[in-house]
Amino acid sequence: WDKSIDDIGLDRGDAVIISVPFSGSGRKHERWKWLIEECNTKDIPVFVDCAWFGTCFDVEVKLNHPCIKMVAFSTGKGLSCGNWRSGIVFSRLADDDRCSLELQTEWRHGIHLNVAIANHLMAKYGPDTMPKKYMEAHAAVCEHYGFETTNTIHIAVAPQTPEWREYHRDETFNRVNIAKAIKRWKSNGNFAQ
């Protein structure tokens, strides 16, 4: 997979998977509007991965475009229950086998304990809980390390310098997961050396 949409464009028969917020930058993808218009025009199906829902803020997209066929949400990051994975997929393909229970597990059954834990947490915490709790820490960590803040609490964008090169995504973003630094700062006000 050495070519991307930026390299070769989109044609009928293609399919698109995109994350919201975009995993490369922790923000809405800068070409979201163009991508959706192009996919609507060329009848290209789109799968939207919203795994970071609950950790992001001020990211707004409409998911009712005809090209968007499936949208997935996860509870791992937003409810801080990563070891108890659960999520939901919404689909326009209701009669299609791709929407069957097979998507959940090879054993053809849901993981009921994980779903029960997620339901309990969702009843208690809203999608803005993490951003509200960690917004100040996110800004402090980004300022301390010279990162750009993003719209995703646990993600920052590092400068395009050699010391951050290992974090690059497609030569465009040096995305850094700052979750541990945020928790450290939030609990004792310290930064790692």
Residue positions per predicted region:
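PLP-dependent class I/II
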Residues: W1-Q193
